[in-house]
């Protein structure tokens, strides 16, 4: 029955499934499993930060979530929906920008399913990483002086992002620059494997909202190398994603339901 569908048709349908349905349909038969190994397909469903195959990174993420939810009454769900404090470093020479950044960080920001309160520590650009007294916080906001040469700007970006190589929990960076510098700074940051946003100072409020979302996604990864692209829109959906106490019969029915849905889509196409 499944062999009657061409590989092109199955691939096309896989592109329209959600992550859960995609996983279940990948188990239908060997042919579908082989098609589902395509990395381009997986990039539609998640972000991958490791070197293993996407399916292996996904399985590792599910195992970690299962462990934490089974052992502590869905601890992860409570963490993802509760209020948190998060700490960051701001590097700037400008007292005016420091004031703007400080004011933007005071309100408690609502990001996805929880509120985040930011606590910042300020440093001057002439401080090296070592001179920051090993104060390795979760994220960096770096103000790039407009009078710097392109070489100095590139060195500054590389200096601060290099900390993520030794401290893998630090991979969220916001670089503030002038409108004219945005294209150049963006071209440099595009070569760096981290969560990076390039902004002007006028966009600092949006930047804090973005930081809150990135930290939320990082918590959802729970020390794994995978993060789903499709984030639950409601707390009910989030609970379903992080809860593993469903009866096996329900899971079995869901599997066949997803398979039938996929076949129905194929017939429509």
Swiss-Prot record:
Domain F-box: 1-45
Superkingdom field: Viruses
PROSITE patterns: FBOX (PS50181)
SUPFAM superfamilies, per database record: F-box domain
Stored InterPro entries: F-box-like_dom_sf, F-box_dom
Pfam hit, one: F-box-like
Name this protein carries in UniProt: Putative F-box protein L127
Species name: Acanthamoeba polyphaga mimivirus (APMV)
């Amino acid at each position: 029955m499944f062999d009657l569908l061409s590989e092109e048709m199955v691939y096309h349908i896989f592109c329209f499934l959600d992550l859960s349905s995609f996983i279940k349909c990948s188990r239908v038969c060997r042919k579908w499993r082989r098609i589902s190994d395509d990395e381009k397909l997986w990039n539609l469903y998640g972000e991958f930060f490791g070197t293993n195959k996407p399916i292996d990174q996904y399985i590792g993420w599910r195992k970690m979530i299962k462990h934490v939810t089974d052992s502590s009454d869905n601890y992860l769900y409570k963490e993802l929906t509760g209020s948190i404090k998060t700490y960051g470093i701001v590097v700037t020479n400008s007292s005016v920008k420091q004031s703007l950044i400080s004011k933007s960080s005071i309100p408690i920001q609502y990001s996805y399913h929880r509120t985040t309160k930011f606590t910042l520590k300020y440093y001057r650009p002439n401080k090296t990483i070592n001179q920051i007294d090993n104060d390795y916080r979760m994220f960096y906001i770096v103000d790039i002086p407009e009078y710097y040469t392109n070489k100095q700007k590139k060195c500054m970006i590389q200096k601060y992002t290099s900390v993520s190589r030794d401290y893998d929990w630090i991979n969220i960076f916001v670089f503030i620059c002038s409108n004219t510098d945005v294209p150049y700074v963006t071209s440099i940051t595009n070569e760096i494997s981290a969560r990076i946003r390039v902004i002007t100072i006028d966009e600092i409020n949006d930047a804090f909202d973005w930081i809150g979302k990135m930290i939320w996604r990082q918590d959802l990864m729970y020390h794994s190398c995978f993060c789903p692209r499709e984030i639950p829109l409601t707390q009910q959906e989030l609970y379903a994603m992080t809860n593993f106490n469903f009866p096996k019969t329900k899971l079995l029915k869901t599997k066949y339901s997803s398979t039938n849905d996929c076949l129905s889509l194929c017939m429509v196409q």
